């Protein structure tokens, strides 16, 4: 971790319109679709802004009514959009069908030729963006979208490092997006080597780096050690674990590694589940908030992140619309199941 410094959090990534059938209807049954907006990094920004953290999201939006509606959506949470690239292209869409019982959730993307995919290196004044920043967060979705978006992401990470920001990455592997030529392993290995904080799950670690996270907390501990050997710049590694009992009943927990400590969190039973989209982003936001707020108390930061993301499963939409007080109440109620430093 970099020395503590005041400043905003900057996030970078595509924002899309989400369209969902009401309730748990299938897309083929729907005669209307519920509309909201979301994107991994923007979801992080919106949660942090609600918790009083100064935050700016950098993205590209089409200069039309859909792009402006997307911007209004983010601004309502207090997210700064001072360096949005407005231009042509389109707003990406995704269709989310909520599952039930043994029918899993499904996602259908319609994001080709979006304004974000058309971003070109040199199009964002990163020195200006980072002038009053302390933290930069990105995810593996951004370089997956297109070759030019990947190069823009690389440019952003290097610019953040040059001015001493803490840089965090959520692997966020999306196999259907990596179709522009280079492999996710090749691109992400270079970018992750520049980061301070890495967030992932067993599936993304296997897909991107070919790593087997094994089972439970001890599996997380072992794979965290291997990641630390591969990427010596990493100072913190968080790994989430989701257990799926049915489409409506999951379990959720995480671990946190640092060079001289390993921390585990309680396991949360998520039942019933309203909406799982954005739960990983809620974890990331909770972790960033905790690391900025609780000093060296890594255990508390991890438990805050897991509690925040468990609450997200009860909130419709991509954004975790809960307060710090609500998160802390959930943490308190789970004191009988607390994690520990290993």
What is the predicted function of each stretch?
Residues 1-80, 100-102, 106, 119-122, ...:
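Glycine-rich phosphate/adenosyl-contacting loop at the front of the ribokinase-like
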Residues 263-333, 338, 342:
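Conserved post-catalytic alpha-helical subdomain immediately downstream of the catalytic base
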Residues 57, 167-169, 198:
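Hydrophobic faces of well-ordered beta-strands that scaffold small-molecule active sites
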Residues 159-166, 231-235:
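A short helix->loop->beta-strand "cap" motif at the edges of active sites that frequently abuts
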Residues 54-143, 327-334, 342:
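Conserved N-terminal subdomain of the carbohydrate kinase-like
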Residues 177-260:
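Conserved phosphate/ATP/ADP-binding segment of small-molecule kinases
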Residues 11-25, 249-266:
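Acidic-glycine-rich active-site phosphate/pyrophosphate-binding loop
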Residues 164-171, 177:
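Short beta-strand/loop segments at the ligand-binding rim of alpha/beta enzyme cores
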């Amino acid at each position: 971790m970099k020395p503590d410094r005041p400043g905003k959090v900057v996030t970078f990534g595509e924002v899309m319109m989400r369209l969902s059938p009401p309730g748990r209807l299938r897309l083929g049954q729907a005669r209307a679709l519920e509309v909201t907006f979301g994107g991994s990094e923007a979801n992080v920004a919106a949660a942090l802004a609600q918790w009083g953290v100064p935050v700016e999201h950098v993205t590209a939006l089409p200069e039309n009514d859909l792009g402006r509606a997307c911007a209004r959506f983010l601004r309502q949470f207090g997210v700064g959009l001072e360096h949005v690239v407005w231009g042509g292209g389109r707003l990406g869409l995704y269709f989310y069908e909520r599952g039930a019982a043994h029918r899993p959730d499904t996602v259908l993307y319609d994001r080709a030729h979006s304004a974000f995919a058309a971003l070109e290196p040199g199009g964002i004044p990163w020195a200006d963006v980072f002038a009053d920043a302390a933290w930069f967060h990105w995810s593996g979705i951004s370089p997956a979208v297109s070759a030019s978006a990947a190069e823009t992401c690389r440019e952003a990470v290097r610019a953040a490092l040059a001015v001493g920001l803490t840089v965090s990455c959520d692997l966020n592997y999306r196999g259907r997006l990596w179709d522009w030529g280079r492999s996710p392993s090749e691109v992400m290995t270079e970018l992750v080597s520049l980061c301070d904080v890495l967030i992932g799950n067993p599936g993304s670690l296997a897909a991107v780096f070919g790593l087997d996270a094994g089972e439970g907390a001890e599996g997380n501990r072992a794979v965290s050690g291997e990641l630390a050997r591969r990427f010596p710049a990493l100072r913190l590694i968080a790994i989430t674990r989701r257990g799926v009992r049915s489409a409506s009943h999951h379990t959720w927990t995480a671990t946190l590694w640092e060079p001289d400590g390993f921390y585990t969190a309680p396991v949360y039973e998520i039942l019933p589940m309203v909406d799982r989209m954005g739960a990983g982003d809620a974890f990331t936001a909770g972790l960033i908030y905790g690391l900025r707020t609780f000093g060296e108390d890594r255990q508390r930061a991890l438990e805050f992140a897991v509690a925040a993301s468990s609450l997200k499963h009860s909130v419709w939409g991509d954004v975790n619309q809960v307060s710090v007080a609500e998160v802390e109440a959930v943490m308190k109620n789970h004191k009988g199941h607390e994690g520990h430093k290993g």
